[in-house]
C-alpha cells in the first residue's frame, strides 16, 4: 500500500508537467526582499502561522476561509506566514500565495510538494520568500539543485525532516533552517518527541522549526525549537483571533480600559479580553456610555468589572454594552451569584478571591476564578502575593491578578494559571495605558524567555 506522501507526489508530478507545458515562463524574476530566516532568528519563540483549508489527516478544516480576514490577523501576530498551495489534498491554490503577497507584510513560505526546479521559480513569481523542501520526497541531487536555485533568487529554504537520516542529508546540503515534522507521513500519526529527539543533533547555527501537532500554548513548553509552524489548530477554531492570541501570548486580560485608543492598542498587540470597571470611586471607572461606545466600536471580547453592584444593574449594563463576561468583586453571596448565573446566557462569570481566602476558590461554581492580593474592592493596587502558594492547585480556570507587569509576566504565567489579568502594571497614570508597557508585555510573552543582558 502506498503512503499518503507517495500518492501526493504522484499527483504533483502530473500537475507540474501540465503546468510546464502551459507556462510561458516567468521572465526576469525579482529576488526576494523579505528575509524569512532573519524573522525567525530573532530572540525567543517565533511563529510561522499557516493558511490551510484542508489536510489529508483532517479533511476539510475551513473551506469557507476568508483570506483577507485571516491575513489581517497574521500580519499582527505572525513572524512569517506559510501558504499551502496544493489544491487536491489541502484545498489551496497558487492564487492564495499571490493574494497573500498583496495583503500581508510578513515573509511568505510557499508550502507545497516540490518535485521540479520549475516550482522554485514559480514560487518566486507568486511572491514567496522561502520554499519548503521535503527530504522524504527528494533525492540528494534534487535537494542541492532546488536549494541552489532558491538561493540564487535570494529565497530561504526550509528543509523538512522526519528522522535522523533525513536530517543528515539536508545538513550535507548546507541547510541553515530545518523544519522537524512531528507527523509521520506514512500513517499521519503525531509524535511531538520527534522535535526533541532531532533537535539535539542540530548544529547551533541551524535554526529549528517544529511542525505539526501543536494545538495549545502548553505544547510549546516541551518543544526545544526556535520557531513553530502552526496551522490546523488555528483554522479549526471558531474564534480565529482568540486562538491565535492564546497560542502566541497566552490568555491575557487588560483591565481598567477607559479610552478607545488604549483598547485598540491592547487588542492589536495581543489582549484576549478588555476589562471595563463600573465603580465610580476608582480613577479607572467608566460610565455605561463610555464603555458602550468602545465595546460596540471594536472587536474582541469584553468583561465588565463590578464592585457590590445590584445584580439587576449588572444585567442591564451587560446588555447595554454587549459584554462577554462579568467579574464580581466585593461581597456577593451565593444567592446573588446563582441569580446572575441563571440570567447570564452566553456570558461567563468570574468570581474574585483574595490571597487571604485562597483555600476557598476551588469551591467556586463560576466559570472562572480570579486570584488577587487585594482583600476587597476593585483591585488595581499593584500588589502581588506569594505565587508559590499556588503550587499543587488546579489552576485551569484561574485568572491571576495583582502586581503583574512586563518584567514579571513570564513568572506569573509560569505558575500554570489559565490567564493573566493586568491593569496598573501597564499604566502611565491610573486609567491611562502606556503603549510602551503594553508592547513590552506582549513582546515578552511572545518570546517566552527573559531578554539576555
Where are these regions (language model features)?
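An N-cap/entry alpha-helix motif that binds or orients negatively charged groups
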Residues: 1-64
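N-terminal small/glycine-rich loop or linker at the start of catalytic domains
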Residues: 39-60, 93-100, 144, 203, ...
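Short beta-strand/loop segments at the ligand-binding rim of alpha/beta enzyme cores
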Residues: 45-47, 101-111, 149-158, 201-211, ...
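Glycine/Thr-rich beta-alpha phosphate-binding loop at enzyme active sites
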Residues: 53-64, 69-90, 170-200, 273, ...
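N-terminal active-site wall of soluble small-molecule enzyme domains
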Residues: 57-151, 155-158, 164-169, 177, ...
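Catalytic cores of alpha/beta
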Residues: 115-127, 162-173, 210-230, 258-269, ...
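Glycine-rich phosphate-binding active-site loops on the catalytic face of alpha/beta enzymes
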Residues: 122-142, 179-189, 225-247, 271-283, ...
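C-terminal helical cap(s) of enzyme catalytic domains, especially alpha/beta-barrels
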Residues: 192-202, 234-252, 288-297, 339-340, ...
Amino acid at each position: 500500500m502506498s503512503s499518503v506522501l507517495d500518492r501526493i507526489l504522484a499527483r504533483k508530478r502530473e500537475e507540474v508537467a501540465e503546468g510546464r507545458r502551459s507556462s510561458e515562463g516567468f521572465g526576469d524574476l525579482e529576488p526576494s526582499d523579505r528575509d524569512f530566516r532573519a524573522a525567525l532568528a530573532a530572540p525567543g519563540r517565533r511563529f510561522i502561522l499557516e493558511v490551510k483549508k484542508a489536510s489529508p489527516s483532517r479533511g476539510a478544516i475551513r473551506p469557507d476561509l476568508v483570506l483577507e480576514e485571516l491575513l489581517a490577523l497574521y500580519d499582527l501576530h505572525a513572524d512569517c506566514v506559510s501558504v499551502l498551495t496544493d489544491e487536491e489534498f489541502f484545498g489551496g491554490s497558487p492564487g492564495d500565495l499571490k493574494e497573500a503577497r498583496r495583503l500581508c507584510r510578513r515573509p511568505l513560505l510557499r508550502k507545497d510538494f516540490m518535485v521540479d526546479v520549475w516550482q522554485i521559480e514559480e514560487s518566486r513569481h507568486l511572491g514567496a520568500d522561502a520554499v519548503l523542501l521535503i527530504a522524504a520526497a527528494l533525492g540528494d541531487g534534487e535537494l542541492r539543485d532546488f536549494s541552489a536555485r532558491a538561493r540564487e533568487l535570494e529565497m530561504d529554504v526550509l528543509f523538512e525532516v522526519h528522522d535522523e537520516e533525513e536530517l543528515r542529508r539536508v545538513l550535507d546540503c548546507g541547510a541553515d533552517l530545518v523544519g522537524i515534522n512531528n507527523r509521520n507521513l506514512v500513517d499521519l500519526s503525531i509524535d511531538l518527541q520527534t522535535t526533541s529527539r532531532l533537535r539535539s543533533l542540530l548544529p547551533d547555527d541551524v535554526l529549528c522549526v517544529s511542525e505539526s501537532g501543536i494545538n495549545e500554548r502548553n505544547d510549546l513548553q516541551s518543544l526545544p525549537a526556535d520557531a513553530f509552524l502552526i496551522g490546523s489548530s488555528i483554522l479549526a477554531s471558531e474564534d480565529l483571533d482568540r486562538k491565535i492570541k492564546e497560542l502566541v501570548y497566552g490568555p491575557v486580560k487588560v483591565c481598567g480600559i477607559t479610552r478607545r485608543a488604549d483598547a485598540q492598542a491592547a487588542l492589536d498587540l495581543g489582549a484576549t479580553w478588555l476589562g471595563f470597571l463600573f465603580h465610580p470611586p476608582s480613577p479607572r471607572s467608566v460610565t455605561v456610555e463610555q464603555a458602550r461606545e468602545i465595546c460596540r466600536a471594536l472587536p474582541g471580547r469584553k468583561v465588565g468589572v463590578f464592585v457590590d453592584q445590584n445584580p439587576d444593574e449588572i444585567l442591564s449594563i451587560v446588555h447595554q454594552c454587549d459584554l462577554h463576561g462579568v467579574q464580581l468583586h466585593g461581597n456577593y453571596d451565593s444567592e446573588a451569584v446563582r441569580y446572575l448565573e441563571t440570567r447570564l446566557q452566553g456570558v461567563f462569570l468570574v468570581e474574585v478571591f483574595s490571597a487571604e481566602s485562597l483555600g476557598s476558590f476551588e469551591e467556586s461554581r463560576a466559570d472562572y476564578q480570579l486570584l488577587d492580593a487585594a482583600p476587597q474592592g476593585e483591585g488595581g493596587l499593584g500588589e502581588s502575593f506569594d505565587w508559590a502558594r499556588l503550587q499543587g492547585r488546579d489552576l485551569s480556570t484561574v485568572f491571576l491578578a495583582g502586581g503583574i507587569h512586563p518584567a514579571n509576566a513570564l513568572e506569573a504565567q509560569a505558575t500554570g494559571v489559565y490567564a493573566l489579568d493586568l491593569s496598573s502594571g501597564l499604566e502611565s497614570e491610573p486609567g491611562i495605558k502606556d503603549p510602551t508597557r503594553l508592547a513590552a508585555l506582549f513582546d515578552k510573552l511572545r518570546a517566552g524567555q527573559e531578554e539576555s543582558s
